[in-house]
């Protein structure tokens, strides 16, 4: 689970939203050649609008990855840095484009929040650096990136124009919760609330766990 809250003027937020949701040449190439539909609907994003695979590798990018069921194809393309799996993992930090993405909020009210899912990891520093350039150009005020893996570990990174930041900086990070207190501290329901056979030592009524 990922979210990026962006604060700024109506003009700056509208500019960022338009950049994230536009149909670019990479998307048009993908669609024209019968590949996965990369066209984002309104208020949906594609990572390629922030950090796009260079046009000279597009043909190789969309060829089968090393995970092909054909052994010869797998051998041919495995461990190359130009197929979609390797390029995305290296540059975006995750193997897929933004999943289940949406943008909520009204630029006129001074804030937008971008929601999206990634495969097992947050987006890369390289991706965030490219996104920070967009924020600078659009003259956005600030942004906070929140990421959390389904097991519970995660973190937050921030960018603030008033601090003359060029890049996102780490604000907070946390490990997988390992106690009832950890869950409460983060405002989450402990696993003991939905798993009768699992309790931490500090869970309420832990004495009754084995009865």
Residue ranges and their predicted role:
Residues 1-211:
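Intrinsic low-complexity, intrinsically disordered or marginally ordered coil/linker segments
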